[in-house]
Amino acid sequence: MSLKDFIFTSESVGEGHPDKVCDQISDAILDAYLEQDPKSRVACETLATTNLVVIAGEITSKGKVDAQEIARNVIRDIGYNDITMGFDADFAVVSAHVHAQSPDISQGVTEGEGLFKEQGAGDQGLMFGFAINETPEFMPMPIYYSHELVKHLAGLRHSNKLKFLRPDAKSQVTVEYKDGKPVRVDTVVISTQHSPDVAHKQIEESLIEECIKKVIPANLLVNTKYFINPTGQFIVGGPHGDAGLTGRKIIVDTYGGYGRHGGGAFSGKDPSKVDRSAAYMGRYIAKNVVASGLADKCEVQLAYAIGVAEPVSVHVDTFGTGKISEEELVKRIRANFKLTPRGIIESLKLLEKGRKYRETASYGHFGRKGSTFTWEKTDKTVALKG
């Protein structure tokens, strides 16, 4: 096979996956603080295991938030409301252990308090944004359909159409590429938690007909292999089956491994943390580059020093698909996008009243629709064309 002929796989996880339970709790707590005080500094981490949730982190805010009650509401919304699952919204022990943000960090991210006048980055680090024109959402096909499968699966569960479904689930999609373009789905894997009183054959048939074939177009399902609950059963799941932690699904949250990742997680962090906000800006830039037709594929790297506003570097890679040089593209990006923490927050309205970061905490942060996902706008295409 040439470099343009290959097979690529990405995975996603459902809202009831233990790590995603933690992401949603952390982001729901973040939302509650920002709703009361947009200047809140939040770094909220969650751990979940058998009927136990531990919330920890650094939070400085004028807001007063009942983190335990928020956690229970999230767990209940997801569907963990039966003690026999080993994790129940009403019976779980929920403890919170938070303290104020370090003053050494605070002075660097608060305008006028650090060595530099402007609001600086909340930490050093590198962040990537990516876009590709192989789906209408400008996302790689493997991660796009992986997300859609677990999202549809959750809908089947919440609507009670498939009564045997329980909250924990994972998906994996393998796509075959010819000449760099996706031509078929080679393999689909779905593992879903279920009640004890259902036969494996029923699960397999139901998921192929009611989930896979409803999500993935028939023209892509050519000689496709299906692996449905391939261990034979999946009764013990959620935080009772595996302990969960915030920030442990960073590849699921982004591009499924198709684009690079700087290593920083998103959930539970307010927008002063460039791990989150600069990754959103990177996606915004890359998507506008591809949507403008200046490249078929684009990856943007932004890098920051703690306490410093301007990025220390901006790098672009169009993988040989660019219509203009990458040097020229960097110039146009710097001219048309605000890359300081404050500029990113203002451009993407990351502190806008009513924003719900919890919406980002399952089914990926990118390729999504809705008012929360402001980094998905393609309103810079004309400016980028010059």
Curated annotation (Swiss-Prot):
Residue ranges of the region described as Flexible loop: 101-111
PROSITE patterns given in the database record: ADOMET_SYNTHASE_1, ADOMET_SYNTHASE_2
The keyword Metal-binding is annotated on this UniProt entry: yes
Residues involved in Mg(2+) binding: D19
GO cellular component: cytoplasm
Subcellular location: Cytoplasm
Family to which this protein belongs: Belongs to the AdoMet synthase family.
Identification of the protein by name: S-adenosylmethionine synthase
Organism: Leptospira borgpetersenii serovar Hardjo-bovis (strain JB197)
Name of the gene this protein is made from: metK
